[in-house]
């Protein structure tokens, strides 16, 4: 680190005035002793020289862009002196505890409940950033859900000891310091809290594969509760994507170790899934009900996105991320970079490597255009949305994967226009990584000017209009430059699967009914659904609060043009009598408004050359 000797000297000189001695946190957790679905966390504290100390579990963590309040899952918080005598503790808020007579503090302990199945705790933690405690089966330890820090002491070293059940393995990017491989204790050491919070762990009976990609060792670890999927199969899907990304990044990777930690859920009521990125790992929460084909596609696309985060925010990040505040975070303006450009690169790398062809790539971009303009505020400033994503614009966050990726695409095409195809966003990312890097943050308000300095004056206008401002992206002009015609008012044919009816719970019950048919599609009308119909089954599968997600997923995945769809409903035929009725209709093709992207039949030589450069073929 630059000027390291001066920083060390400064730390020694100021240690006394800060009120804390420079030592380490020593945490321990015993996975063999859960109680009531909770684990006990014990911390032997670093010496404290202040009268009071405030201990935090995070309110927000990097990459989630949502308030999670991990302290809500901690209970029975206690503090002790060296003789084991209790010290007074006051809970300040959901995530903070104030300890009195802190100069005497020696140990704290508390119990942690998991986020995945604790409905009585009214928080909403997305599963990839959550925790799971299942005795003798599996433990998911997102570190920030178990381990905290004293206010002002985030940069002290951490030592975490985990006692594991016999035969369990801890999948993580961290290196186990305990060389006794036959023992049941793992010991992990990190430089500070940020490094610990950035490293999830999953403990279970192992199904793992190690891959070698360029200079990096890659761990793939899968938990499939019903053994439907094996790690070797997912690793085979992931490796070509990683090879493509290595080539996309210039032939080497900015890491030497990485872990894909994958949990396949067998929950029948699963309505959401996804992943959370970390600097040297990513954690996945995916449905075990996926077909092999769907899982293969999903893992390629999601892994491609998450793995690209090794570049940003690992090597390119603002001060807001480099020195993240877990309690009162200041959001960066640049979600277009962290998530949008990452999403763009994930698909662009697959195109350049030949993993997907141009028609497939363009289909994905059409979906992003349609989703951005129909599901989100397409005129909202992206920088404003980013800064206020925790509250005012939290519902707009998914647009980072839609319009954010389109911003990345547009920037790439604009750079290639200006450079004659010789310079694009992957070159820009390499230049930004060289300018900043893992230990040097950029100032949030200066990034656009720095990018302009590295590229072309016209790029400042691009950011001003389309990222800071709300002007529509110039997709027509940019696609035209590579010989592709964009029609925002196009149409496409598709199998109509939507019913266009509203679902709701029948009053006083947990039974699902048809609430309204005002916006019924042609399919919904042909089925003959009526308001107040109680849905018994769809396609002969029981339709309940527990099964509705898997039933609809099965329908969406497996039913094709010409197949017959059925609803079994209970319909009132009189005030006190209901009759079970089976309704059927066949799936038909419909023409719907949709943006289209079509390669020109006769592009100019200049357009063709620029397209080849963009797709990864050298300019002739």
How would you name each of these model-derived features?
Residues 346-347, 355-620:
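C-terminal recognition in membrane/secretory proteostasis and scaffolding
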Residues 116, 168, 249, 253, ...:
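A generic secondary-structure signal for well-formed alpha-helical elements
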Residues 43, 207-334:
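Juxtacatalytic substrate-recognition/specificity segment
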Residues 22-60, 140-145:
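Early extracytoplasmic/domain-onset interaction patches
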Residues 24-26, 38-42, 52-54, 105-107, ...:
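Intrinsic-disorder/low-complexity, polar/charged segments enriched in Ser/Thr/Lys/Arg/Asp/Glu/Gln
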């Amino acid at each position: 680190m630059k000027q390291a000797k001066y920083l060390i000297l400064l730390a020694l000189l100021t240690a006394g005035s800060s009120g804390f001695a420079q030592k380490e946190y020593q945490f321990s957790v015993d996975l063999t002793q859960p109680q009531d679905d909770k684990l006990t966390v014990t911390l032997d504290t670093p010496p404290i020289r202040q009268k009071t100390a405030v201990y935090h579990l995070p309110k927000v963590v990097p990459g989630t862009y949502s308030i999670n309040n991990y302290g809500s899952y901690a209970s029975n918080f206690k503090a002790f002196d060296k003789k084991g005598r209790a010290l007074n503790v006051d809970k300040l808020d959901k995530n903070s505890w104030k300890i009195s007579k802190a100069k005497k503090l020696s140990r704290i302990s508390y119990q942690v409940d998991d986020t995945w199945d604790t409905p009585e705790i009214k928080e909403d933690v997305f599963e990839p950033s959550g925790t799971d405690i299942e005795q003798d089966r599996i433990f998911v330890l997102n570190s920030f859900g178990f381990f905290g820090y004293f206010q002002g002491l985030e940069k002290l070293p951490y030592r975490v000891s985990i006692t594991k059940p016999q035969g369990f393995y801890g999948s993580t990017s961290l290196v186990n310091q305990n060389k006794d491989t036959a023992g049941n204790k793992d010991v992990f050491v990190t430089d500070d809290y940020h490094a610990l919070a950035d490293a999830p762990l999953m403990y279970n009976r192992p199904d793992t594969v190690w891959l070698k990609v360029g200079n990096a060792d890659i761990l793939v670890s899968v938990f499939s509760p019903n053994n439907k999927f094996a790690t070797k199969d997912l690793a085979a899907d992931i490796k070509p994507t990683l090879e493509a990304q290595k080539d996309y990044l210039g032939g080497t990777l900015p890491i030497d170790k990485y872990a894909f930690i994958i949990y396949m859920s067998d929950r029948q009521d699963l309505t959401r899934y996804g992943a959370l990125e970390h600097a040297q790992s990513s954690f996945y929460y995916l449905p075990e009900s996926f077909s092999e084909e769907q899982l293969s596609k999903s893992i390629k696309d999601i892994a491609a996105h998450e793995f690209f985060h090794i570049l940003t925010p690992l090597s390119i990040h603002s001060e807001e991320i480099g020195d993240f505040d877990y309690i009162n975070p200041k959001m960066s303006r640049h979600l277009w970079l962290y998530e949008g450009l990452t999403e763009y690169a994930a698909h662009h790398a697959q195109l350049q490597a030949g993993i997907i062809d141009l028609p497939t790539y363009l289909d994905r971009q059409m979906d992003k255009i349609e989703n951005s303009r129909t599901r989100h505020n397409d005129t909202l400033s992206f920088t404003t949305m980013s800064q206020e994503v925790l509250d005012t614009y939290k519902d707009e966050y998914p647009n980072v994967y839609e319009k954010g990726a389109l911003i990345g695409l547009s920037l790439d095409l604009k750079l290639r226009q200006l450079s004659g195809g010789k310079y694009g966003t992957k070159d820009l990312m390499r230049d930004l990584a060289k300018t900043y890097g893992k230990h040097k943050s950029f100032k949030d308000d200066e990034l656009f000017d720095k990018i302009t300095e590295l590229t072309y004056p016209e790029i400042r206008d691009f950011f001003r209009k389309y990222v800071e401002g709300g002007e529509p992206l110039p997709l027509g002009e940019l696609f035209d430059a590579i010989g592709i015609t964009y029609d925002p008012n196009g149409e496409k044919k598709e199998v109509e699967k939507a019913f266009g009816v509203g679902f709701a719970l029948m009053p006083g019950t947990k039974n699902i009914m048809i609430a309204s048919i005002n916006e019924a599609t042609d399919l919904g009308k042909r089925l003959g659904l009526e308001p107040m119909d109680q849905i018994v089954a769809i396609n002969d599968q029981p339709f309940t609060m527990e099964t509705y997600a898997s039933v609809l997923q099965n329908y969406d995945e497996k039913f094709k043009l010409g197949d017959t769809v059925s609803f079994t409903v209970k319909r009132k035929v009189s005030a006190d009598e209901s009759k079970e009725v089976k309704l059927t209709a066949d799936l038909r093709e419909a023409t719907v408004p949709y943006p289209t992207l079509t390669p020109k039949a006769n592009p100019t030589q200049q357009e063709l050359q620029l397209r080849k450069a963009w797709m990864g073929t050298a300019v002739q």
